[in-house]
């Protein structure tokens, strides 16, 4: 469902944009619990309130005569943002967040290529924990968490609970092995900053699908909170020695 208020003269095929986006993310089959080609798309858009538009079309500073280009566009409401810029990375994002995003991007690339880890499905998330010294400098990567949705690619030998448990354990072992031997080498190969490469070591703890089997996911498994809360997704928030950040694909 697409809901909201907008004022525009453009003629936009919103249902088709929604379908194309869902398919591009990877939900293109009913076997995955959601199919962008056949799902219902309900559009409930209305014209933006004229009262709100007054604040958006022209900022308060511009109305008061402050001649600044940045003040040409206003805001119709308040929002809360949390984060900071840092020189840990070239894009000024905290290193933990940058690595989390990189892991998920490479994981999505592998899924779309369809040559390795062919059991992958779109829903995934990652968390990276980094150890810092007393000067706030990253010294090593402590923990990497990768949770990824997957096909039910190993079937139990029979209908018993023990057989199902064995199949689930074999799937988890395969995913863990592939994350360490296929995903992470490609992630590391995509990094060019020597100071970041030096943080990888043999002592990194990997948690791969730590809750177990992850077949049901995406829109079919979770409605999510995005757009229905003031703030939950943040970056930054560094603690004393260990600093974590997570990210989700697409």
Predicted regions and their residues:
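A glycine-rich, aromatic-flanked flexible loop/lid motif
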Residues: 223-242
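A glycine-rich helix N-cap at a beta->alpha junction
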Residues: 19-30
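Glycine-rich, mobile lid/loop segments that gate access to catalytic sites or pores
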Residues: 27, 36-216
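Short, charge-patterned binding micro-sites
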Residues: 1-8
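Histidine- and/or cysteine-centered catalytic micro-motif in compact active-site loops
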Residues: 5, 211, 219, 235-237
